[in-house]
Amino acid sequence: AKPAKRVAVTGAAGQIAYSLL
């Protein structure tokens, strides 16, 4: 579980959630 990968996934999810808002 590389931190960079987790950040990338979180960032993508955040962008999607923001778009839905």
Curated annotation (Swiss-Prot):
Which reactions is this enzyme annotated as catalysing? (S)-malate + NAD(+) = oxaloacetate + NADH + H(+)
Enzyme type, top EC level: oxidoreductase
Keywords for this protein: NAD, Oxidoreductase, Tricarboxylic acid cycle
Instruction: Give GO BP annotations, semicolon-separated.
Output: tricarboxylic acid cycle
The entry's NAD(+)-binding residues are 11-17
Enzyme Commission number(s) from the entry: 1.1.1.37
Q: Give the GO molecular function terms.
A: L-malate dehydrogenase (NAD+) activity
The superkingdom listed in its UniProt entry is Bacteria
State the family named in the UniProt similarity comment for this chain.
Answer: Belongs to the LDH/MDH superfamily. MDH type 2 family.
Q: What does this protein do?
A: Catalyzes the reversible oxidation of malate to oxaloacetate.
Protein name listed in UniProt: Malate dehydrogenase
Q: Which organism is it from?
A: Burkholderia cepacia
What's the encoding gene here?
A: mdh
